[in-house]
Amino acid sequence: MPHSNLDVSELFAQRQAQRSSMHARHLNEQLVRVLKTIGYDVGFQKGQGQYLYDRDGVRYLDLLSGFGVFAIGRNHPALRHALKSVLDADFPNLVQMDVSTLAGVLAERLIEHAPYMDKVFFANSGAETVEAAIKFARGATGRPGIVHCAHSFHGLSYGALSLTDDWNFRSGFEPLLPGCTAIPFNDLAALDKALSSREVAAFIVEPIQGKGVNMPSDEFLPGAAALCRKYGTL
């Protein structure tokens, strides 16, 4: 059956001027309002390396880098080449009754850099990673509890939101996952008290809290690791 090829670049060029109106109608009207309020409804057109370019060609230094997704820069030539080679190879991807060769290669490479590990579990986002960590911790320890810190942000899916200590995100979605307890960030005494019940499967913590950019003391994370080992908590 004949078909026409989709030219995504042409489609982008045709509709980019309507991006705000389309999002306001069909996606997230509030985000459109916020971008206009803070002056960022600039219509980014291109990303190269560490820079973004708006509709007028103004260049911006991208210090966010997609929350770390673009750690090697946007549209890096080596990454573009790798993606193109995958598309051109017609690999049998996402076959239910098979295992992935490339996933095996990546897991092997990762473990070469972290030889204290035996297995790898891949996830597609931070929130999904937190969800998996909750399951692994409860399954491995047989314990129900999860401890996290005040002012934390771990994601917006159900389990991850249960560990996100921010009313603005949680409001309207409670009750959330039971067994989750918040302690003050940087407070080893509070952590000791929370773990001493030996009912806590895991302590999930950000090395640096992104919401507010709260830094731990030099003693907090090593001390937390020691307490987790003491009480059998992951």
Task: For the regions a language model picked out, list residue spans one by one.
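Active-site-adjacent loop/helix segments that line or gate small-molecule/cofactor pockets in enzymes
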Residues: 2-48, 102
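Glycine-rich loop-to-alpha-helix module at the N-terminal edge of alpha/beta enzyme cores
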Residues: 6, 31, 59-147
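A short, flexible beta-alpha/helix-coil linker loop
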Residues: 66, 89-90, 188, 207-211
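Hydrophobic "anchor" residues on beta-strands that sit immediately upstream
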Residues: 58, 202, 233-234
